[in-house]
């Protein structure tokens, strides 16, 4: 099918009348085979690993070696204002911008994270985008893709298997017996096990469990629990590793527990690190998919931004930047958490420098931040969000200004994308445009949900202009800044906090880290709610006068991250009373999946 024929067909797909999965099903009749997509990118046949006709993995190491002397393309991050619980269309905007740049004749790629089954079957959906700006094929993308998250889950849980077995065998056997198995007693403290089990669902009943209750042959009775797979340190490692040797070294450093004398127990101590790495071998290569309009999209790694690093992989971005003139990557949630981690973690570890950041804003979210009624997933929107209310928008723009300031603090050029909804009025949009421009940002109104790449023309042109303008990219803090000062700097300059407080648990862990000095050069990966600039999801707008409470500090030695946990946020989300799985099914005649979004 020619490009013009494909465009003509896509124009018949009306998001106002069709569900996302219905649009995807029709558009998938005209997908480019992965082989064609790879050829257009400049990949050789031996650099792609097909997974069916429309999904492939790409040998990143081979491509990077072949293209090591090729200059990088322009590097664009898509972030957002603080969202409502419904999301503001950041993934949709990412796909729309990729399509918009492609529509202008640019060689462009995108990169997004693999969706977790947790939100897919719960509330938020698959993060494939929506309307006429989606990542396809939808069902494989949404339902496990090539098994990367399963590999992460299995690798993580193998460490737990090794740890639990070691505790049991040391409890049941003498030193002489252990020695006969070439084992040295590790003397693990069951009360100081750092690791939990992993599962890729939202399962609140598994947050805290008692295990090993059957007897001596059934394990060691102890308190444990589960986190969602995408919060695993193994997933963070998949996001930040730069090559197989780096991956192997990182997998050996994961701290799983502490000994009775306070020394850490690592995956290397359990002799499980090699096997854990082996489980990841097929997951290390990025997955190649495409937009509805046929531009290439790399999908790799899937950590959340509120409870993890919130970025697709470094290797996917490095790969794409060698293949394209413009590469659009996405960081999770708002600029306070997703972009901050892109800025101070991903770019620091990768050595890559962005040219531009797109901040997605909606009239709906700004009304919420201006004092609008509560937005609840599954419940009808209050009329305040579907009828004109310029005053709410004007007041809510304070939240947008905070995110613009964060991007400008990084020294790069912000572009505010007003993601257009049908109920938006010209007056409301003018308020957002005027406020953002006065703050030094470019502004574009984008209709990509309704019109695909053509609807993102203004956005694409604004991004090109921003990328062509010089910038002064720099990090928020030097890598040797003391940990307490680093946490304070993020809290003050990004969140707007007056100060930071610590629980006794956090203070004790902080003191141990400061005494060892092991974390001096490790970036801070903050864990906090995505629903507010603060730690409290109820505080909307641009809150001030608050103290950021750090209740715990986790140490991810393998990923090379210190993880301060702010407020009451959990590493295992819960499933709602009206989850998406109620609406997902198959067509028994065609074998296709219905109800995904």
Curated annotation (Swiss-Prot):
InterPro entries: Formate_THF_ligase, Formate_THF_ligase_CS, P-loop_NTPase. ATP binds at residues 84-91. It catalyses: (6S)-5,6,7,8-tetrahydrofolate + formate + ATP = (6R)-10-formyltetrahydrofolate + ADP + phosphate. Pfam families: FTHFS. Keywords: ATP-binding, Ligase, Nucleotide-binding, One-carbon metabolism. Its EC number is 6.3.4.3. GO terms for molecular function: ATP binding; formate-tetrahydrofolate ligase activity. It is an enzyme of class 6 (ligase). HAMAP family: FTHFS (MF_01543). This is Formate--tetrahydrofolate ligase.
């Amino acid at each position: 099918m020619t490009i013009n024929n494909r465009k003509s067909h896509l124009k018949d797909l009306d998001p106002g009348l069709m569900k996302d999965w219905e649009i995807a099903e029709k558009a998938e009749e005209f997908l480019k085979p992965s082989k064609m997509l790879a050829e257009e990118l400049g990949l050789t046949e031996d650099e792609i690993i097909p997974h069916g006709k429309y999904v492939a993995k790409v040998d990143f190491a081979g491509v990077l070696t072949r293209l090591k002397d090729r200059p990088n393309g322009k590097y664009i991050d898509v972030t957002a204002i603080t969202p409502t619980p419904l999301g503001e269309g950041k993934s949709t905007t990412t796909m729309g911008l990729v399509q918009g740049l492609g529509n202008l004749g640019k060689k462009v790629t995108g990169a997004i994270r693999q969706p977790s089954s947790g939100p897919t079957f719960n509330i938020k959906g698959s993060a494939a985008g929506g309307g006429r700006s989606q990542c396809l094929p939808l069902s494989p993308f949404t339902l496990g893709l090539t098994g990367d998250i399963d590999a992460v889950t299995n690798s993580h849980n193998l460490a737990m298997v090794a740890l639990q077995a070691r505790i049991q065998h040391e409890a049941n056997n003498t030193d002489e017996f252990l020695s006969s198995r070439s084992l040295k007693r590790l003397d693990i403290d069951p009360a100081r096990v750092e690791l939990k089990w992993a599962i890729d669902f939202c399962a609140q009943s598994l947050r805290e469990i008692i295990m090993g209750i059957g007897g001596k042959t059934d394990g060691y009775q102890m308190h444990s629990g589960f986190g969602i797979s995408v919060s695993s340190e193994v997933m963070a490692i998949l996001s930040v590793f730069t090559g197989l040797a780096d991956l192997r070294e990182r997998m050996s450093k994961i701290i799983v527990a502490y000994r009775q004398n306070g020394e850490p127990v690592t995956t290397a101590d359990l002799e499980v690190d090699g096997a854990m790495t082996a489980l990841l071998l097929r997951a290390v290569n990025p997955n190649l998919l495409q937009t509805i309009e046929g531009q290439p999209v790399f999908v790799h790694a899937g950590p959340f931004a509120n409870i993890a690093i919130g970025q697709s992989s470094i290797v996917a971005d490095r790969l794409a930047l060698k293949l394209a003139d413009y590469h659009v990557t996405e960081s999770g949630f708002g600029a306070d958490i997703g972009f901050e981690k892109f800025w101070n973690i991903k770019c620091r570890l990768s050595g890559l420098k962005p040219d531009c950041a797109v901040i997605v804003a909606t009239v709906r979210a700004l009304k919420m931040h201006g004092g609008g009624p509560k937005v609840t997933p599954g419940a009808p929107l209050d009329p305040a969000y579907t009828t004109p209310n310029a005053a709410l928008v004007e007041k809510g723009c304070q939240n947008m200004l905070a995110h613009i300031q964060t991007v400008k603090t990084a020294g790069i050029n912000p572009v505010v994308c007003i993601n257009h909804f049908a109920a938006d009025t010209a007056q409301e949009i003018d308020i957002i445009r005027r406020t953002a421009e006065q703050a030094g940002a470019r502004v574009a109104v984008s209709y990509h949900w309704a019109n695909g790449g053509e609807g993102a023309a203004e956005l694409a042109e604004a991004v090109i202009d921003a990328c062509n303008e010089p910038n002064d990219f720099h990090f928020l803090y030097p890598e040797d800044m003391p940990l307490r000062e680093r946490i304070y700097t993020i809290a003050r300059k990004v969140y707007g906090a007056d100060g930071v407080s610590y629980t006794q648990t956090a203070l004790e862990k902080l003191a141990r880290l400061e005494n060892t000095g092991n974390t001096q050069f490790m970036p801070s990966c903050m864990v906090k709610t995505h629903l507010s600039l603060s730690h409290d999801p109820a505080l909307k707008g641009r809150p001030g006068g608050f103290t950021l409470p750090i209740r715990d500090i986790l140490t991810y030695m393998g990923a090379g991250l210190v993880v301060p946990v702010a407020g009451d946020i959990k590493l295992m989300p819960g499933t709602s009373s009206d989850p998406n799985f109620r609406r997902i099914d198959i067509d028994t005649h065609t074998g296709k999946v219905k109800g995904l979004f």
